[in-house]
């Protein structure tokens, strides 16, 4: 329901031609393996992948954060209880953010939304490495509630604006979900090594710096708007 508020362009009425033109249009709009593979030839696809490589670090950050947070309290029981409160508050704020994010993205644009989410993510990680005490760490973790809704909504809208709309679900699964999982799997052992060797705070500083670097570079790589003329030829459906 939230994503339906995204106004990504005018909806075109289906073309109906004599002699079963509507069936021909449906046939032509089907996605083939060749259509999906053609994404690999698009520079803007790899630009999106580059951004995702940096943004998916937040999953690795969240994996061991409970251990770091609980360690800030005198007892494990007290720390675990406080983390439960933290997690509950964060979930409610994220839900509220999902209602506000489409309104924001429709005004600042999908690219700016992605950059904003990436920068907030970097600030959150770097802040977790700089601040001390459970209260400040509690606050830095809550920033995630402002970051995640903007990231998700911006990603959906960016994909819809800049790629063949027939491939939007494929792009989201491969370009965002799958890539995040694969990169997270590769980064997790490195993060674990950092936790054991130099500690949580220095590792968070490194992770935040990586996110900042990839997000800053993405300012020049991501496309500012949806240019339909730049879509691959396969997105053009001609009905005789």
PLM features: what roles do these ranges have?
Residues 166-197:
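A late C-terminal transmembrane helix in Major Facilitator Superfamily
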């Amino acid at each position: 329901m939230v994503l339906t508020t995204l106004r990504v362009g005018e909806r075109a009425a289906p073309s109906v031609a004599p002699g079963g033109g509507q069936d021909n249009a449906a046939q032509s709009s089907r996605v083939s393996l060749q259509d999906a593979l053609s994404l690999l030839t698009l520079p803007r696809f790899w630009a999106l992948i580059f951004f995702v490589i940096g943004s998916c670090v937040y999953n690795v950050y969240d994996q061991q954060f409970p251990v770091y947070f609980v360690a800030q309290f005198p007892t494990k029981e007290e720390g675990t209880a406080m983390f439960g409160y933290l997690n509950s508050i964060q979930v409610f704020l994220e839900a509220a953010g999902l209602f506000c994010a489409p309104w924001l993205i429709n005004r600042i644009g999908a690219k700016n939304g992605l950059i904003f989410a990436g920068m907030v993510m970097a600030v959150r990680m770097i802040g977790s490495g700089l601040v001390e005490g459970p209260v400040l760490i509690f606050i830095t973790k809550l920033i995630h509630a402002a970051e995640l809704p903007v990231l998700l909504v911006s990603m959906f809208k960016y994909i819809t604006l800049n790629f063949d709309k027939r491939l939007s679900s494929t792009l989201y699964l491969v370009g965002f979900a799958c890539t995040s999982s694969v990169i997270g799997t590769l980064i997790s052992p490195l993060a674990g090594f950092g936790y054991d060797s130099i500690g949580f705070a220095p590792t968070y500083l490194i992770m935040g710096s990586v996110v900042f670097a990839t997000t800053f570079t993405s300012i020049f790589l991501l496309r500012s708007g949806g240019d339909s003329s730049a879509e691959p030829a396969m997105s053009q459906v001609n009905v005789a």
